[in-house]
Regions:
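Nucleotidyltransferase catalytic core that binds NTPs
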Residues: 2-237
Length: 243
């Protein structure tokens, strides 16, 4: 298999305009690779980006510690069907500088689905502004015909769909959802799973167990109740469990 083309200069993306785009923060796992394979099935050139985005991390979060195995990621992306791997510099995406870009992300008008009560924005009010800013700038540079995002981050997927649909710059870009890929024990694959201590792994699986338990509930209220009960039984600190 031919190694993917490595692109660092945004101008080099012009030759791949109209392709299928898979944005990632790297530390690729089988969930990411399933998105790249889905993009490859489109028959269009596949561009995978790797960029750990500072505007979606709060000061107390793990930006500096986030894994960055870039050489490994390039190899895996190519094996999964990526024709090019885009490695943007922070300055190419945020020419205004990091602090100014963080302030800009915080001030962006974001889709209403990002502000649903009791969901991600309640605990991480910075997050979706940062996601919308980086995705918008990547889409401007890559100019794809389609982009693939995972269903694991369900609210994020809906935010991106709403942003793309409402922004004239992105008309005609198809947002393709990619199914969740799980570990053998049911935990959704995530780049952060490697940081879960082995003694806490069973507790972490309470997330999947809570969703499984909710599936058989007769009403949304019953589903939320059984999710909370299951999460508490696994000794998990619950931020939200909402249908």
């Amino acid at each position: 298999m031919t190694a993917p083309r490595i692109i660092q200069n945004p101008a080099e993306l012009d030759a791949l305009a109209g392709g299928c785009f898979v944005p990632t923060m790297g530390a690729l796992h089988q969930g990411h690779l399933s998105l790249i394979r889905a993009a490859a099935r489109s028959g269009d050139p596949v561009i995978t980006s790797i960029f750990v985005n500072p505007t979606q991390f709060a000061p107390n979060e793990d930006f500096d510690a986030y894994p960055r195995p870039v050489d490994r990621d390039i190899k895996l992306a190519g094996e999964a069907g990526s024709d090019a791997v885009y490695l943007p510099s922070e300055s190419s995406l945020y020419p205004e500088g990091r602090e100014a870009s963080i302030d800009l992300a915080a001030s962006l008008p974001i889709p209403e689905v990002a502000k649903r009560p009791q969901l991600e924005d309640a605990g991480r009010p910075h997050f979706f502004g940062g996601v919308c800013l980086v995705v918008a700038r990547l889409l401007e540079q890559v100019r794809p015909s389609a982009a693939v995002f995972g269903e694991k981050d369900w609210q994020q997927l809906q935010v991106i769909r709403a942003m793309v649909a409402s922004d004239a710059r992105f008309q005609g870009i198809e947002v393709i959802p990619g199914p969740i890929v799980r570990e053998r024990d049911g935990l959704a694959m995530s780049s952060r799973n490697a940081s879960i201590p082995s003694m806490h792994r069973e507790r972490a699986c309470g997330l999947a167990n809570a969703l499984d338990a909710a599936e058989s509930a007769k009403t949304p209220a019953d589903a939320e109740s059984v999710m909370r009960t299951t999460l508490e039984a696994h000794q998990l600190a619950m931020e939200y469990a909402v249908i």
